């Protein structure tokens, strides 16, 4: 006789009922809603996302189009199921619709191995591909340049396409390039990527400037004048502080999480969260498992070392790097983060900075792994349901999914309108403000992209 059978026979029926009731109570206390209650949360989540736009701060589909098909949109149909590709993508139009996405900042990313004219060309090619996406699927996408545009496009039943530039190296140390990128639709600039720029320190490189240089501060001021969001994801803590001190408008972290919960330098420490609240800005939670789970962050260190080794071994063969890295992962399984842990980061940022200063910046299609329960862009309703289960009100959820970033956009637009009345375009040059101009020790051909 099995132990379970013996226990079942020994327990009276009344006691069994009591045990089951107790188990249900414990399950609810542990955060598991009853099936009926969970269905209510899920239905409410969908209703909320039909009433208010979900605006995600960071998605790398443009990079995928460049790397997979050299920007040939006729070779990769976003209206089809891209999860069947090798490797699978996390974004396509059917899944965007299922996820009730209302607006998306598409990242126009340039590898940090590119500098000067090469970087500028690459970023404008990425900007161009976002415009062509919107033109190719007009029934689904429309370009947006203001908060009002996002809301208008959402009401029309389409998805607002916004552009975010990832990495200050992509402006080629030129404020004129920055202005032209804005004219072409870019609405945020991430001041650095993995490596320092000539005017700002990154979180993941050696600090060479002690934050922002004089030219770096001028970049922030010109962004304020233009109406471009200052994005502090990827930058060092000192760069965060310098930008917060310099900016006259609210800042954003387009895809970062809470360092108190996962001690990654890409995440935001509590003292900065409080400064973001005072600034009126927003931290948009990144879904990368290594930024969400401390266990995963520690476990991923050997993976990062292997990735670096393969990139150095095959610098001109990214497909081989991807294939060998996939084989390495198969032999070295890693733990994963969960949807609930993503919600924990939202909780923490709300608790430290306030409900008005947290949003979503998934980094889909820029991350190779995703949390359990947040596998792709179709899963946003599940995250919203989890927030409702935790007691967030519908109004607070609407702030998190899009209301907060739209508020920040409006404030940035208002600041720009005010500054443009008294301030002409900056004519500052890096060689005049920062003497001598620094040259990154990772610049081509001395190094490779650390991504």
What are these regions (language model features)?
Residues 218-232, 236-242, 272-278, 348:
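Substrate-binding cleft of carbohydrate-active enzyme catalytic domains
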Residues 22-210, 263-451:
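N-terminal hydrophobic targeting/anchoring segments and the immediately downstream early-domain regions
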Residues 54-61, 235, 253-257:
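Histidine-centered catalytic micro-motifs
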Residues 237-238, 258-260, 289-292:
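Short, catalytically relevant binding-site loops at active-site mouths
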Residues 209-224, 243-253, 383:
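Alpha-helix-loop-beta-strand connector modules within alpha/beta enzyme cores
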Residues 174-178, 239-249:
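Distinct, well-ordered alpha-helical segments
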């Amino acid at each position: 006789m099995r132990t379970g059978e013996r226990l079942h026979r020994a327990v009276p029926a009344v006691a069994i009922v009591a045990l089951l009731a107790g188990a249900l109570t414990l399950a609810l206390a542990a955060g598991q809603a009853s099936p009926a209650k969970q269905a209510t949360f899920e239905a409410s989540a969908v209703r909320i996302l039909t009433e208010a736009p979900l605006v995600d701060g960071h998605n790398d589909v443009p990079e995928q189009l460049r790397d997979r098909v050299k920007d040939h949109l006729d070779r990769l149909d976003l209206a089809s199921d891209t999860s069947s590709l090798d490797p699978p993508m996390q974004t396509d139009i059917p899944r965007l619709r299922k996820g009730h996405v209302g607006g998306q900042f598409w990242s126009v990313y340039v590898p940090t191995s590119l500098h000067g004219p090469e970087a500028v060309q690459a970023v404008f090619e990425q900007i161009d591909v976002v415009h062509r996406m919107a033109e190719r699927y007009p029934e689904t996408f429309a370009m947006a340049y203001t908060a009002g545009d996002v809301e208008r496009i959402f009401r029309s039943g389409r998805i607002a396409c916004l552009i975010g530039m990832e990495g200050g190296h992509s402006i080629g140390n030129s404020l004129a390039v920055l202005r032209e990128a804005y004219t072409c639709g870019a609405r945020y600039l991430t001041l650095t990527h993995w490596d320092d720029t000539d005017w700002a320190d990154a979180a993941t490189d050696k600090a060479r400037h002690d934050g922002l240089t004089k030219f770096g501060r001028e970049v922030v001021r010109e962004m304020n004048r233009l109406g471009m969001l200052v994005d502090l994801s990827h930058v060092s803590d000192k760069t965060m502080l310098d930008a917060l001190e310099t900016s006259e408008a609210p800042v954003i972290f387009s895809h970062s999480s809470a360092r108190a919960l996962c001690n990654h330098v890409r995440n935001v420490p509590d003292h900065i969260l409080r400064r973001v609240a005072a600034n009126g800005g927003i931290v948009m939670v990144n879904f990368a498992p290594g930024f969400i789970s401390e266990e995963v962050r520690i476990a991923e260190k050997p993976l990062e070392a292997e990735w670096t080794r393969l990139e150095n071994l095959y610098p001109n063969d990214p497909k081989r790097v991807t294939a060998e890295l996939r084989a390495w992962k198969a032999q070295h399984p890693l733990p994963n983060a969960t949807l609930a842990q993503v919600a924990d980061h939202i909780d923490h940022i709300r608790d430290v900075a306030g409900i008005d200063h947290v949003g979503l910046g998934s980094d889909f299609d820029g991350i190779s792994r995703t949390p359990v329960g947040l596998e792709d862009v179709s899963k946003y309703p599940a995250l919203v349901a989890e927030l409702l289960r935790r007691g967030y009100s519908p109004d607070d959820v609407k702030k998190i999914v899009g209301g907060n970033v739209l508020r920040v956009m409006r404030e940035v637009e208002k600041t720009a309108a005010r500054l443009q009345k008294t301030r002409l375009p900056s004519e500052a040059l890096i060689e005049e403000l920062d003497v001598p101009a620094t040259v990154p020790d990772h610049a081509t051909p001395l190094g490779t992209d650390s991504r």
